[in-house]
């Protein structure tokens, strides 16, 4: 596992997104031993050619983080994870001090009521019932009713709240459900997408619900022993057919890769625990725009599978050139290394 470790200085972790969105730096790796190129995301259309299919993840981050209070006045934080039968799975903090049956209320929205149930998973997940005006909030599409009390959950390494709330959402976000953003897509603007279309490329959308597991590092010595988290995904038939017919498929973000490569190995929708790591093949994706990832993460291992150990040179170059890392950081454009 040491080979997937690298030193990430605190100063390199972006605390706020680039403004405007497409002003973020873009490190371009053309492969085949060619030197790296340094550009900005605004230059992305120059890397796209006629006939490309560019695929984005249109998932939307829900207001899943709720600051609530018990009747006694104690503060409790609830992080909604995903709908389950009769309620939601959620992380509750401080979990051990909140008994099953406890009712929680929001000072921001008196119409919101949360009832904490039993523990349902080894990691402390609890079953909870969410009510708004006495009506159940039963699925992700209904979480818009929580917007007054809830907020988008930011990754634990982002402490700044100086950015506008909408900046942790892509401009094309449509399908509610995620508790984390598909961060490579945060760089794209409507204008940039139109420039890509003007190049004769086609833009297609998939939906992969990004779960809390995306932040979990690999803690075992052998990646083969890592238990990969599962997420829901959907690839429309029209998008699938476009990718099948394309000369080159460009994925925006690792979540898009996971959706497409899961579809290639099974069905066009469902749940996936696909772990793309060294030795994995990429059946659909030819090029990838993605952010710089955490050490020892499954996302970094996906990059290693996609381009080989060249990622180490890319990350070293990025740190030397003061690129910003992680969710609000800069990006890189990679071409698949043929094995």
Regions found by a protein language model. Name each.
Residues 1-339:
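Surface-exposed, charge/polar-rich loops and edge strands
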